[in-house]
Design a protein with these regions (language model features):
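Bacterial N-terminal signal peptides
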Residues: 6-15
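Compositionally biased low-complexity segments at domain edges in trafficked proteins
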Residues: 122-193, 197-232
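Edge beta-strands of extracellular beta-sandwich domains
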Residues: 106-113
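Tryptophan-paired
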Residues: 47-103
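Short, surface-exposed binding/anchoring microloops in extracellular/periplasmic proteins
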Residues: 21-53, 60
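Short, surface-exposed linear segments at secondary-structure transitions and domain or protein termini
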Residues: 65-71, 116-127
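Positively charged n-region of N-terminal signal peptides that target proteins for export
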Residues: 1-4
Length: 232
């Protein structure tokens, strides 16, 4: 009888180990989207884990506009806002986000596989000037020409530099049924954007597509390195 109990206990422990190995790792995290010199709208966000949808939101916010001074001075940096709460949502391994670029007058789709160790990266804490911070803000940036970067940023923006997780050229969406009925420009009032910024962009041309890669790399290289004291 005792031998049977030991065998049963060992079998249960094995099942628990297997279950733990496959379980989703949970961490406090959030997401956001933005641009480095453009007006944009985020229109859909979906996160996946092991092939299943864990978060989906058909809609989102738009930013106010691109700063005149930054366009003239060629000052490029990622900015934007946060998304909806992700409380209780496991850390995803894949993301799909749809954004409208006012400069390009296009709707783009970004599809990206996220690092396998993303939960661990998000959980790592750092001492920064006597305070604790961690990189658990997943940020999606879209630049003119469809260039995108996926970054891992500090929760309170204290820990730097931002970590580049992925980059590439987003795919222009041509399969949206409503876009075929009403143009993207009409849906989002892009004509007003053109009136306000059209001449400015002609006078001060900006990079396009992968031309952004070295520019944004240089921006990150200038960020202070405040991740020197990880919390063990």
């Amino acid at each position: 009888m005792l031998k049977y109990l030991f065998l049963l206990f060992g079998f249960c422990m094995s099942l628990m180990a297997c279950s733990t190995g496959n379980a989703a790792i949970r961490a406090n995290w959030s997401y956001g989207s933005g641009s480095n010199i453009d007006s944009f709208c985020t229109t859909k966000v979906t996160f996946y884990l092991h092939g299943k949808t864990v978060f989906s939101y058909p809609g989102g916010g738009c930013n106010a506009g691109a700063p005149y001074k930054d366009i003239i001075e060629k000052k490029y940096y990622w900015s934007g806002g946060g998304g909806l709460p992700t409380d209780g949502v496991p850390v995803p391994d894949k993301a799909e986000i749809e954004m409208v670029s006012f400069h390009d007058r296009k709707r783009y789709r970004i599809k990206v596989d996220l690092p396998a160790d993303l939960p661990q990266q998000m959980q790592q804490q750092y001492q920064v000037r006597g305070k604790i911070d961690q990189r658990n803000w997943l940020y999606f940036g879209l630049a003119p020409g469809g260039y995108y970067e996926v970054l891992l940023k500090g929760d309170k923006l204290r820990v730097k530099p931002d970590l580049l997780l992925a980059r590439g050229i987003a795919k222009e969406m041509t399969d949206d049924w409503y876009d075929k009925k009403v143009s993207v420009a009409e849906q989002y009032g892009i004509e007003d954007f053109d009136k306000e910024y059209g001449e400015l962009f002609k006078q001060h041309p900006i990079p396009r597509g992968m031309e952004w890669a070295p520019i944004m790399d240089a921006y990150r290289a200038r960020q202070p390195k405040t991740d020197q004291y990880p919390v063990q």
